[in-house]
Every structure is written in C-alpha cells, then in structure tokens.
Amino acid sequence: MRRLGPWVVSVVVGLSCSTVFAETGKAVIQGTSAGSKVSGTAKLTDTRQGLKVVVNVAGVPPGKHGLHIHEKGACGDQGKAAGGHFNPAKVPHGFLPKDGPTKAHAGDMGNIDVGPNGSGKLAVVLPGVSLKGTGGTPSVDGRAIILHEKVDDFGQPTGNAGGRIGCGVIETTKE
C-alpha cells in the first residue's frame, strides 16, 4: 500500500498539469455581396443532445431570416457556391430541433430574429448531427452556414427563404 502512494500522487500531478482541448467549430459569417454590412460568428459544440449552434449576426435587415447549413464549404458566387441544404438523409425540409432527423434536413436551423439595430442571436441544438461525424452522425465540418434574406416558412422543398445574404465556412478549432 505504501508503494501505491507515490504512483497516485504522480498520476494526479500529471493529470492536473495536462491540458485537455475540446474540439469546437466556428464560422465567420460575411456578406455575400459587395458593400454588404452583414457580419457574424457561429460557434458549434457537440453535446449529448446533438450539435449546439450559437449564431450572432450584425448588419442584417430587421426581421426573421432563414439559417441553414449547406452542403459545401464555399461562399463564392453570392453564396451559391455553398450548394443546397445539407441533407444527407434525403428527407423533406423542416425544423430539425422540432421535427427530428427523419423529417428535416440535417442543416435546418430555423430562423434568426434580427432586431431594429440589425443584430440577432440564435442558439439551437441540432439532434442527430455532429461536428466531426461522431457515432456515425452526419458531419458539418467544412460545410457552410448560410443566412437567407427572408424568413424560412418551412415549406417544400427549401423553405422559401430567398437569396443568400451571409455565409461562413465551418472550421474545427481547439478550445
């Protein structure tokens, strides 16, 4: 028993000195057209319930705007380079947090409400999705977040949210 003491102390000291980094994702959102004042950030964190996404935007026209993860990690051509909604299960459009992964695209985040000052925040958990494809779930790493010009009415096939006014590519970071 006496010999175990120094070993336990060395393990505890070693663990307390090590740094553990959690992988998170981030996207820097910028306007998709010349002269646009749209800007923002998205932070993505895996949780037991799914992928937590927190988006903050500024310089956006007031009102509700559709917010989706798109299939490609590119923002060129006024956001069109991002392709369509991220939909690996080939299911109808919907609101993922409410409808679940069998009745909504993997990237359907709903709407962000932007106030009169042009800023807005959305915090949502996307079930059945992860940053890096953990546990066989679809991965969003390297894909784009698109801010649309209009409200997502959850209609088919893509919610009628109009053009793409903001875009940011999701990248993995260490925290």
Where in the sequence are the language-model features?
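N-terminal secretory signal peptides that target proteins for export/translocation
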Residues: 1-2
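N-terminal leader/targeting pre-sequences
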Residues: 5, 12-14, 18-175
